[in-house]
Design a protein with these regions (language model features):
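Domain-level recognition of nuclease-like catalytic cores that cleave nucleotide substrates
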Residues: 88-141
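Charged, non-catalytic accessory extensions
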Residues: 1-14, 19-20, 24-27, 31
């Protein structure tokens, strides 16, 4: 099991934040009339595969952070999927409120990685500014 202390507490809190974020994204997808399926945790590239009423796929990467977070990390696989299928990709950002799930806020950032060029950068992940990325988002789409 986990060793008690700050690291174990952080891991437990992180898992709770991620769970609330995914739950919020699943609910938003259902509200849009789509059929979302949560992917296994080890799925590379996206967290939710959603199907539109027309049968089209939407690939959703969910990032949840406690309100006030400065940044977040996105993996190279997540960026590459968003670049390869830009029209079908959504980055869903969920600001998790300490006041409970009913106060969580959600933004969709469509086609965020369309024009990104990592060149020969030997990166495994990229850290993005939460507020600047949040500002590019919209209500669920």
């Amino acid at each position: 099991g986990l060793i008690p202390g700050p690291i174990a507490t952080h891991a437990k809190e992180t898992a709770g934040v991620e769970r609330r974020a995914v739950d919020a994204a699943l609910a938003a997808e259902r509200a849009l009339g789509r059929e979302p399926i949560e992917m296994p945790h080890n799925n590379t590239g996206y967290d939710i595969h959603s199907t539109t009423p027309e049968g089209d796929s939407v690939f959703i990467e969910v990032k949840g952070r406690i309100a006030g977070a400065e940044d977040f990390t996105i993996t190279l696989n997540e960026v590459l999927l968003g670049k390869n299928v830009p029209a079908a990709h959504r980055l869903v950002m969920v600001e998790v409120s300490p006041d409970g799930p009913e106060h969580d806020q959600l933004r969709y950032v469509a086609e965020h990685f369309r024009s990104i060029n990592l060149g020969d950068l030997a990166a495994t992940d990229v850290r993005l500014n939460w507020a600047k990325t949040w500002d590019r988002g919209t209500p669920p789409c």
